[in-house]
Amino acid sequence: MSDGDYDYLIKFLALGDSGVGKTSVLYQYTDGKFNSKFITTVGIDFREKRVVYRANGPDGTVGRGQRIHLQLWDTAGQERFRSLTTAFFRDAMGFLLLFDLTNEQSFLNVRNWISQLQMHAYCENPDIVLCGNKSDLEDQRAVKEEEARELAEKYGIPYFETSAANGTNISQAIEMLLDLIMKRMERCVDKSWIPEGVVRSNGHTSTDQLSEEKEKGLCGC
Amino acid sequence: MADTIFSSGNDQWVCPNDRQLALRAKLQTGWSVHTYQTEKQRRTQCLSPGEVEVILQVIQRAERLDILEQQRIGRLVERLETMQKNVMGNGVSQCLLCGEMLGFLGSSSVFCKDCRKKVCTKCGIEASPGQKRPLWLCKICSEQREVWKRSGAWFYKGLPKYILPLKTPGRADDPHFRPLPVEPTEPQPQSAEVSRVYTWARGRVVSSDSDSDSDLSSSSLEDRPMPSGIKGTKYDKPRGDSGGSMESPRMGPARPPSHLSGSQSSLGSETGAGATDPQGGTLPRPEPRVSGKRHTWATTHY
C-alpha cells in the first residue's frame, strides 16, 4: 500500500456531527469491519484504500481500469475541533457528508455543514455525497427517507442510506463520489486546453461555439 | 515537535499561509496570542498535550504519503520532458514527433488540437473516438493532459510540488541549458548517443512500470501492431542528417500551456509561498510564449 504505483491520488473528507458514524463508515469501507464501541476522533485522521476506477464512456464502452489511491480524511465533529478540521477542507477533492438517521438534530445540522463547506472548501460548489447513516436501526429511525432525499435534491447532491454496521451502500456512496470527481477532472482538463480567440472561420464555427458553451457551463471549478 | 514540523527543511523564512496560521492557533504553537480570551475560555478550548500528539502523528503520516506522491509526479514530469526533448520534426512538412515527411508524397497527417502541429497518424491519438468530428492530439499533448490529471494540477490550479528521479540528475538539467546556446559540432555525436541510449532505456521502463498502461492504450488506438520497431528505425535516420535540422525543431514547436505555479498540497508540510486559490475562480490561461514557458519551467526545478 505504501508505494507510489498508482495513477491518481484522490483525497476525500468525511464530515458531519459528532457520533453520526464517520469513523465507522470509513473503517467499514477500508477494512470491512465494524466496531460498535464509540471512540471519539481526536481532531483529524485519515485512512487509505486502493481501488480501480472504470469510467463509462459516452458511447457506453467501459474504459480501461485506472488505479486510484484514495486518501480518506476523517474529521472530528465536535465544536472544539472545528477550526482545526475546517483547515483540511481546502485540500479535499470531494466530501462525504454524514448524518444519523436516528438523530434528527444531526440531520438539521446538514445545512450548517454545507455552509461550512461553501466557506472552506476549494470552491463554492464542491462535490458532495449525502449519507444517512445507521439505516440498520429501523426501529429508532427519526428521519424519513423522503425528507432526506428532498434535502439532497434541493442541494443537487446524491443521497445514500448507509449502515456502517452491515456495510449497506457504503461502497456505492464512495464510488459515486469518485465518479463525480473523475468526471469533474475530465471537464477541467478539457476546458483549460481550449485556446480562446483561436476559433477559425470555417464551416464548424457554430459547432465549436456550442461545444465551448456546454463545457463552460459544466465545469464548476 | 510542532516547531520541527513547521520550520524544518527551509532555512529561508516564508510567511505562513492562512491554513498554517489556523492550525498553529488551534495547536497553541507559533505566534498565536489569545489576548481577549478569559482563562476559563482558554482552558476549555485548548487541546491537551495528548491530543496534540495524536494530531501531529496523523500529520506526519500524511507527509509520508505526500513524499511518495511528489516522487510519482516527478516521474510523470520527467517522462513528459523526455518526450518534449526528443521531437524530431518541424510539425509542418514533417511529423512533429518522428520527423517523417508528410503531405503529397509522404504519409497522411493529422492536426493536433492543442499545439496545432502536424503529426503522422501513428504519432497522434484520437481524443474522442466516438464522436462525429474526430479530434486528434499528438502524443506529447496527450501526455501533457495525462500529467495534468494525474498530478492533481487540475485541482490545485497548477502543477504541485514534485521530486525528480535522482537516478538521472544530469539529464534533468539538459532541457533547460542545451536549447539556449548553439551547440558546437563535436559534442553532438555524444548527445545523440546519450539520447539513443536513454530512449532505449526508457523503452524498458515503459514495459515494467505504470507507463506501460498508457502505451497499451496508445497501441490499441493505432492500426499497425508494431509501432515501436518502426519508430525506432525512423528515429535513427534524421540523426544522420545535418545539425541544422536538429536545431530547428527545438525552436519551432511551441509547448502547450502548462501552469507551474506552486500549490499547497498538504497543510503544514510545505512552507513555500503558494498562490492563494480563488474559490470558484476560472482556470488561468496565460499567453503561450516559448521563452516564458521555459523560464517558468526552469524556475520550478530550483
Curated annotation (Swiss-Prot), chain A:
Its EC number is 3.6.5.2. It is an enzyme of class 3 (hydrolase). CDD domains: Rab27A. High levels in eye, intestine, lung, pancreas and spleen, and low or absent in brain, liver, heart, kidney, and skeletal muscle. A motif (Effector region) lies at residues 38-46. GO terms for molecular function: G protein activity; GDP binding; GTP binding; GTPase activity; myosin V binding; protein domain specific binding. This is Ras-related protein Rab-27A. Belongs to the small GTPase superfamily. Rab family. Regulated by guanine nucleotide exchange factors (GEFs) which promote the exchange of bound GDP for free GTP, GTPase activating proteins (GAPs) which increase the GTP hydrolysis activity, and GDP dissociation inhibitors which inhibit the dissociation of the nucleotide from the GTPase. Activated by GEFs such as DENND10. It is found in: Membrane; Melanosome; Late endosome; Lysosome. NCBIfam families: small_GTP. InterPro entries: P-loop_NTPase (IPR027417), Rab27a/b (IPR041837), Small_GTP-bd (IPR005225), Small_GTPase (IPR001806), Small_GTPase_Rab (IPR050305). The gene is Rab27a. The modification Phosphoserine is found at S2. GTP binds at residues 16-24, 74-78, 133-136, 163-165. A lipid is attached at C219, C221 (S-geranylgeranyl cysteine). It catalyses: GTP + H2O = GDP + phosphate + H(+). Its main location: membrane. It is a lipid-anchor. It comes from the Eukaryota.
Swiss-Prot record, chain B:
Keywords: Cytoplasm, Cytoplasmic vesicle, Exocytosis, Membrane, Metal-binding, Phosphoprotein, Zinc, Zinc-finger. Its main location: cytoplasm. Highly expressed in pancreatic islets and parotid. High to moderate expression in adrenal gland, pituitary gland and ovary. GO terms for molecular function: LIM domain binding; small GTPase binding; zinc ion binding. It holds the Pfam family FYVE_2. It is found in: Cytoplasm; Cytoplasmic vesicle, Secretory vesicle membrane. A zinc finger (FYVE-type) spans 89-146. Zn(2+) 2 binds at C112, C115, C138, C141. GO terms for biological process: calcium-dependent activation of synaptic vesicle fusion; G protein-coupled receptor signaling pathway; glucose homeostasis; intracellular protein transport; negative regulation of G protein-coupled receptor signaling pathway; positive regulation of calcium ion-dependent exocytosis; positive regulation of insulin secretion; positive regulation of protein secretion. InterPro entries: FYVE_2, Noc2_FYVE, Rab_BD, Rabphilin/DOC2/Noc2, Znf_FYVE-rel, Znf_FYVE_PHD, Znf_RING/FYVE/PHD. The keyword Calcium does not apply. Residues 174-194, 206-302 are annotated as: Disordered. One of its GO terms (cellular component) is presynapse. Residues 41-158 form the RabBD domain. Residues 258-269 have a biased composition (Low complexity). The modification Phosphoserine is found at S248. Zn(2+) 1 binds at C95, C98, C120, C123. The N-terminus of the RabBD domain is necessary and sufficient for interaction with RAB27A. Recruited to dense-core vesicles through specific interaction with RAB27A in endocrine cells. Interacts with RAB3A, RAB3B, RAB3C and RAB3D. Interacts with ZYX. Rab GTPase effector involved in the late steps of regulated exocytosis, both in endocrine and exocrine cells. Regulates the exocytosis of dense-core vesicles in neuroendocrine cells through interaction with RAB27A. Acts as a potential RAB3B effector protein in epithelial cells. This is Rab effector Noc2. The gene is Rph3al.
